[in-house]
């Protein structure tokens, strides 16, 4: 488009020269202005760049103006937002000669009707990253997207500006919702959509040698309907009476901010899947974190606890109701009567009085009394800073139970002088009733002994079908003797610290997307973070309290272990004067990172992984360790192995695609002259201890020269140092970025064509919600 130049020029009559003088005449051309643009039209609310050319003057600057919309000093037109097309005029005026200008007519085109063009969504799979971008046409950008009705799957979020659905779904099903888009002119459009999430852990499926859970609990609020009446219990009211009188389908609200002291027995009623009883704070849902979001003590008015990760409170208003156990011993404040079923708890603080004696379980079943269908949702469950409290919730004897989006703190036992030796945030696996399925999802779990433990007591059955996902398992460093701000028992003795996650009796367990931080030795254990040890222990006068106990079909994947004395302990071993348990094996461990494993800093054993059999029968077998990125203590082995040569060999051992620090003694014996690993030569150890085995495509970083490649099984790698591997950021194996650079020699070098070591992207997607 070219505009005609404006004519604002003038001429000057030359003076008359004296006689005999030659005069040169100077004629001044008028200043001319022209404007141009790449188009004669622009969309509603759009932009169009204009250019001005000024002739016959050294000052080529112009002033811009427009009849509608706005235009910058550089000539960029911002068109008005119009509902019908119309013409506007753009003017460029010479600064040197304000009478000289040029104009251009531009058609502003009305936007097409706003419409969402996305009408179907691709399906997703639980546990796998999902991404989909919604599209719209017409209207005037930018767009803003919201969910108008319905809900997204847990783990999926809508980004309002980008219109993208992303995250890692944790529950299968078909989710129906309506999405709304609004343009900058405040026009709106809606579209009904359905997102189908398939279950990657359907009944009968496997991860390597391990069978995955056969049953998964659906625990959304929509899955626990309570269509009955609501009863409110205010401060000073009778909560127990409300429990006793509630009908199936009712809701009991406890006054937000109020304290309800006592021991409350949750009674048996003939409820069903369509008629749950909900017990919750009276605060509205808008005062709590959204469903699927972890609660913190902020919602009980506590801005921060010493030594814990930041709560990042947006406010500290107390909107929770508190149940507090006032007894001097025993368990409480919540006990389930025999047969109690279909109860959901939301937005409550559950605790005990300080300064009292040892308390066992804050939440649990009555002794030898089964319960079922229990959901703890957005709860703060905690002991006190110095007192002994054994467990937050005890799941033994409970079936179909879930702990979701909750916060557990201050469960600990005092060393030497204490009344207990093991404390857990969540425990189970004892007693004589069927147990499971369980769902432990998106919680902060803190305890001195084991953050999560299944087993360790008398039992005739094994809990099964256990889903443990996207939790943060944490021990405060202020519990470590000698650490600044040390906190111990009332007498100053330290708390007994053992590990983060231990199984002594469990089967079909999926442990995925979890963050494990801080554990140390110095007590009865050696600071391993993860322990898989089936136990038929001595309890009381019984020396074989659980011959039926087993740990089988365990999948550990897409998780991180940091700040520990040792990594993973896999052992079938007799201990505590007990006997041989029923079984241990079929473990799939893959895509896990282990860093800051330091035996000196955390007072413990040091090996990255221990694999040991101490039984003459029910031999350990079916172990797959694949795609691990791990940096153990440099003075300890990457793999410690043990089995007496009088026992059958351990079977079906797979160790592939791992990227680990070799250590001073890369593959070493767990001890004893009759140990199959006594030679400590890697090839000899592997072939003597395991049959059959697969041991290929592993990179052992900084292997000592003594352990030359000829002393190893074939087809493995020996990078001289971490720099040779080409991590994105090794950071001395402390919180680094363990992606491989594109030029790494171990890029796509695995048996499956993937990078050696863990899939860092997959881990990050899984643990995003765990922090």
Residues of each region from the PLM?
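Acidic, glycine- and Ser/Thr-rich low-complexity intrinsically disordered tracts
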Residues: 202-229, 297-310, 314, 318, ...
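Beta-solenoid repeat scaffold
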Residues: 221-226, 248-255, 261-322, 337-346, ...
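Right-handed parallel beta-helix
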Residues: 276, 341-352, 370-384, 399-414, ...
């Amino acid at each position: 488009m070219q505009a005609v130049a404006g004519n604002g020029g003038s001429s000057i009559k030359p003076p008359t020269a004296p006689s005999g003088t030659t005069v040169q005449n100077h004629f001044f051309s008028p200043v001319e202005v022209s404007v141009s643009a790449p188009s004669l039209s622009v969309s509603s609310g759009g932009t169009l760049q204009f250019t001005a050319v000024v002739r016959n003057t050294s000052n080529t600057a112009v002033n811009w103006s427009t009849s509608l919309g706005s235009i910058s000093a550089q000539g960029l037109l911002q068109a008005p937002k119009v509902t019908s097309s119309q013409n506007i005029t753009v003017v460029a005026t010479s600064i040197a000669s304000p009478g000289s200008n040029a104009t251009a007519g531009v058609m502003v085109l009305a936007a097409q009707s706003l419409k969402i063009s996305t009408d179907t969504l691709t399906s997703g799979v639980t546990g796998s990253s999902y991404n989909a971008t919604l599209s719209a046409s017409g209207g005037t950008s930018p767009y803003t997207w919201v969910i108008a009705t319905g809900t997204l799957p847990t783990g999926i979020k809508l980004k309002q500006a980008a219109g993208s659905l992303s995250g890692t779904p944790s529950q299968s099903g078909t989710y129906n919702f309506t999405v709304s888009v609004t343009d900058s002119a405040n026009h709106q459009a809606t579209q009904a959509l359905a997102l189908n999430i398939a279950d990657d852990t359907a009944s009968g499926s496997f991860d390597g040698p391990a069978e995955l859970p056969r049953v998964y609990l659906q625990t959304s609020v929509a899955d626990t309907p309570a269509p009955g009446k609501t009863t409110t219990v205010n401060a000073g009211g009778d909560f127990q009476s409300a429990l006793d009188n509630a009908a199936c389908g009712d809701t009991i609200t406890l006054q937000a901010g109020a304290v309800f002291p006592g021991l409350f027995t949750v009674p048996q009623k003939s409820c069903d899947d369509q008629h749950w009883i909900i017990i919750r704070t009276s605060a509205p849902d808008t005062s709590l974190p959204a469903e699927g979001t972890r609660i913190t003590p902020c919602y009980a008015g506590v801005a921060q606890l010493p030594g814990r990760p930041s709560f990042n409170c947006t406010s500290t208003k107390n909107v929770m109701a508190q149940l507090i156990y006032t007894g001097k011993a025993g368990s409480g404040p919540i006990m389930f009567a025999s047969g109690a079923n279909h109860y959901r708890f939301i937005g409550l603080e559950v605790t005990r009085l300080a300064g009292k004696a040892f308390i066992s379980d804050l939440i649990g079943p009555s002794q030898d009394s089964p319960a079922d269908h229990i959901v703890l949702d957005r709860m703060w469950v905690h002991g006190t800073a110095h007192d002994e409290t054994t467990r937050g919730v005890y799941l033994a004897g409970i079936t179909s139970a879930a702990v979701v989006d909750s916060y557990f703190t201050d469960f600990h036992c005092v060393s030497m002088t204490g009344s207990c030796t093991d404390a857990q945030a969540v425990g189970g696996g004892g007693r004589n009733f069927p147990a499971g399925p369980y769902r432990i999802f998106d919680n902060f779990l803190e305890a001195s002994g084991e953050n999560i433990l299944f087993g360790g007591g008398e039992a005739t059955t094994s809990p099964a079908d256990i889903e443990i996902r996207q939790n943060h398992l944490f021990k405060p460093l202020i519990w470590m003797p000698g650490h600044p701000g040390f906190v111990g028992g009332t007498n100053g003795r330290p708390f007994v610290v053992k590990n983060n996650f231990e199984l002594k009796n469990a089967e079909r367990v999926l442990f995925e997307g979890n963050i494990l931080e801080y554990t140390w030795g110095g007590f009865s254990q050696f600071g391993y973070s993860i322990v898989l040890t089936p136990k038929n222990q001595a309890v009381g006068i019984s020396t074989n309290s659980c011959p039926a106990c087993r740990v089988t079909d365990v999948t550990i994947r897409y998780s991180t272990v940091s700040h520990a004395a040792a990594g993973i302990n896999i052992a079938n071993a007799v201990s505590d004067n007990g006997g041989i348990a029923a079984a241990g094996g079929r473990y799939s461990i893959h895509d896990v990172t282990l860093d800051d494993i330091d035996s000196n800093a955390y007072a413990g054993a040091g090996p990255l992984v221990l694999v040991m059999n101490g039984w003459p029968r029910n031999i350990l077998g079916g172990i797959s360790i694949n795609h691990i990125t791990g940096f153990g203590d440099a003075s300890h082995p990457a793999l410690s192995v043990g089995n007496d040569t009088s026992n059958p060999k351990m079977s079906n051992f797979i160790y592939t695609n791992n990227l680990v620090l070799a250590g001073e003694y890369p593959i070493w014996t767990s001890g004893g002259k009759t140990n199959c690993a006594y030679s400590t030569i890697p090839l000899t150890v592997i072939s003597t201890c395991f049959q059959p085995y697969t041991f290929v495509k592993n990179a052992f970083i900084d292997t000592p020269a003594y352990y030359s490649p000829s002393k190893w099984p074939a087809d493995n790698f020996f990078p001289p140092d971490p720099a040779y591997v080409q991590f994105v950021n090794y950071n001395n194996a402390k919180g680094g970025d363990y992606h491989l650079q594109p030029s790494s020699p171990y890029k796509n070098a695995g048996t499956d064509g993937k990078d050696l070591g863990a899939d860092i992207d997959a881990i990050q997607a899984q643990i995003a919600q765990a922090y």
